């Protein structure tokens, strides 16, 4: 069985929040893997051992297949992060659209923008927003200063560009690969070089990769510092530790041809991704309110943009599973002035999904 309506490893039903904040046992992720792409003509080679050319480990995860070039995509984000503070929009657009580091064996370049404009991906973001390319639409508008970003300062647009690329697109790419792995597993395609485990490996390559300080892995560590949820080393988020463990479990399940084990691991992986971006949603909403109390409306607008960019990563988890996202959207959406609602209003929307995933107070922490 593949993942259902909204993400890897979900079961039937939806996580609709009731007044008591309970959640039914189902919801799950940012994706829709119900479209389990058939792997017609693909290999059904029995699972086994890593390939001879398997990429060396990254961050404690031993790849089973070759993702030498996939793990370099995050280096493009390093290049973007180096210049985004100087608002070099045209240079960023060039890196985004044409890529730099992830050169494939045929000489073509794997690009962040190329993924963002791709239609029919298994991340569910398009399903939720009802448009074919919502990831690219968001980033391109921020780069060009159009749509909701028209008339906004460079500092505000920076949040849409940087968080849109580093987090929205990269997490959607991770989720797409997890769901692609589940779809191949459902088809019995456990070929190590090109089947389910290869997509699973790609998910870690896009999340951590060759430069973990530039991608989602780094965001998780920052939010853990904010919320008091760093691991025993004082540097790594509990969410990153949990995600790594889930990725290892899923890899091993796929090598063993264990589809059910992979579904369970994908659900656990989604839990830890959710923690990071739920934390980010709360943090930047709180900063908006404190900015306004201090009379700093420009800072409030910047933090609203940052919070909105982060919230859009988990919004499909909520919305695709029957939870009303309008309260948080009204607080963070850039179409609205900052300052409505409260952190408590946001927490009330998130609580049912926190309960569904079994996220403990120690795992989620607290801000401030």
Where are these predicted regions, by residue range?
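Ser/Thr-rich, Pro/Gly/Ala-heavy low-complexity intrinsically disordered linkers and tails
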Residues: 1-47
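Mature extracytoplasmic or organellar-lumen-exposed domains after removal of signal/transit peptides
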Residues: 46-368
